[in-house]
């Protein structure tokens, strides 16, 4: 096993522990707590894959971090912070919408890359909107936290979420997953729209009519299913 893989896991475990202690003091905001829960699942998956104990890895990670901090000057820390681009957390959904329970009459599930897509194919003749909570860096979608499909009545009929055991996904992964979700929901005469926020940061360039600029193959599959957010 590569030593960098092990040490990276150890440091991630310790930093998660520090963030958890911070959250236990009720100091974390909603985006912070979202990432904390997501990263916990990711660490469990990585630990299982690597065959490493999380508690032992956390102790080793603490030693690595302490050694780095002993060698770190205040000036070097300032330069490092200044060179790292800051990401922003954007929310289409409220906490209620993110945690809302839902069930599927005709369930369908598909995994594409590190993203899991779920939808209810029993939905008919509905106007559906896709909303997402995600982080943005350099004005592009960086990490998807959760995407859900809602009817006008507020019912959840579809979802895209990262797989805890397969961390990491790209902007293109998210767009491809959205294409799969829309393709599944378009049956039974449903109309699917993507929120303005998601359009803006997942697809930086748009057509004149406001529709996202899809790749040619994806565009052919979706051109009759997407309407811009009003």
UniProtKB/Swiss-Prot annotation:
InterPro entries: NS1, NS1A, NS1A_effect_dom-like_sf, uS15_NS1_RNA-bd_sf
Alphabetically ordered keywords of this record: Eukaryotic host gene expression shutoff by virus, Host cytoplasm, Host gene expression shutoff by virus, Host mRNA suppression by virus, Host nucleus, Host-virus interaction, Inhibition of host innate immune response by virus, Inhibition of host interferon signaling pathway by virus, Inhibition of host PKR by virus, Inhibition of host pre-mRNA processing by virus, Inhibition of host RIG-I by virus, Inhibition of host RLR pathway by virus, Interferon antiviral system evasion, RNA-binding, Ubl conjugation, Viral immunoevasion
Record region (Disordered): 205-230
PTM field: Upon interferon induction, ISGylated via host HERC5; this results in the impairment of NS1 interaction with RNA targets due to its inability to form homodimers and to interact with host EIF2AK2/PKR.
Keyword Calcium recorded: no
Species of provenance: Influenza A virus (strain A/Equine/Alaska/1/1991 H3N8)
Subunit structure: Homodimer. Interacts with host TRIM25 (via coiled coil); this interaction specifically inhibits TRIM25 multimerization and TRIM25-mediated RIGI CARD ubiquitination. Interacts with human EIF2AK2/PKR, CPSF4, IVNS1ABP and PABPN1.
Annotated region described as RNA-binding and homodimerization, given as residue ranges: 1-73
NAD as UniProt keyword: no
CPSF4-binding: annotated segments: 180-215
Annotated protein name in UniProt: Non-structural protein 1
Motif Nuclear localization signal per UniProt: ranges: 34-38
Pfam families hit by this protein: Flu_NS1
GO biological process, one term: symbiont-mediated suppression of host type I interferon-mediated signaling pathway
Span of the annotated motif Nuclear export signal: 137-146
Region (PABPN1-binding): 223-230
Superkingdom of the source species: Viruses
Chain's role: Inhibits post-transcriptional processing of cellular pre-mRNA, by binding and inhibiting two cellular proteins that are required for the 3'-end processing of cellular pre-mRNAs: the 30 kDa cleavage and polyadenylation specificity factor/CPSF4 and the poly(A)-binding protein 2/PABPN1. In turn, unprocessed 3' end pre-mRNAs accumulate in the host nucleus and are no longer exported to the cytoplasm. Cellular protein synthesis is thereby shut off very early after virus infection.
GO CC aspect terms: host cell cytoplasm; host cell nucleus
Family: Belongs to the influenza A viruses NS1 family.
